[in-house]
Amino acid sequence: TYRDQANALEKAIEKHFGYEIEGFHSYRYYEGNDILRSWICMPLVMGIYTRTQGTIDALFSPRLWTDDGLLTQAGTETFWDRSTLYALRGTIAAGEVEKGMNFLKKYSHRRLLGDHVPYAIEAWPEGDQRHLSAESGLYCRIYTEGLFGIRPTGLRSFEMTPRLPQEWEYMNLNRVRAFNSEFDIRVRRAGKKLHVEILKGGKPVLKKSVTEGATIKVNL
């Protein structure tokens, strides 16, 4: 089954890429690699959390993180928005919401409001800050797949693991067009839990209170 294949692939990734690199319990980029690379964020994006803490510590360490996001390789000056945006999404999805939001705010202020071009870029100095639509899409996916934790499971179904930042009381995602439907997602704090509602045409099709980090299955 696909699940069996996914489990086998996860074990293979851990066996080959799992590594202690520059003092961090994270991943190497290839066999023989001993320098941190920003692409260590990819397992987090794919829901592999075996080395979460070491990977997040490495990503936001001075070796990789700069005012402009992640260096593609420690010790260089080239930064890539693509790996930065993946890393922010993966960090939030892994449950490190406050750290992820802190760096997301810094990135957003710098890139969207700062003294650089006002959009997510490809890379610098490589690429000369090109505007690629993929990077803008990845910025949006921090919210849809990081904060709301949406993951498709079928043509009309998905899972979601909402991550509501501590300083927020609620978050909504309205008029989502996906899974052959148009629907709204509403998440609000309810004591120590999160109350989640899915609405179609203004009518609730799901109401559920869950603990932080719990996954909800949705069929539309």
Predicted regions and their residues:
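Active-site core of glycosidic bond-cleaving carbohydrate-active enzymes
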Residues: 4, 18-142, 146, 150-152
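Non-catalytic C-terminal accessory modules of carbohydrate-active enzymes
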Residues: 93-220
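Extended hydrophobic/Leu-rich segments
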Residues: 16-17, 52, 210, 218
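Active-site neighborhood of glycoside hydrolase catalytic domains
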Residues: 1-17
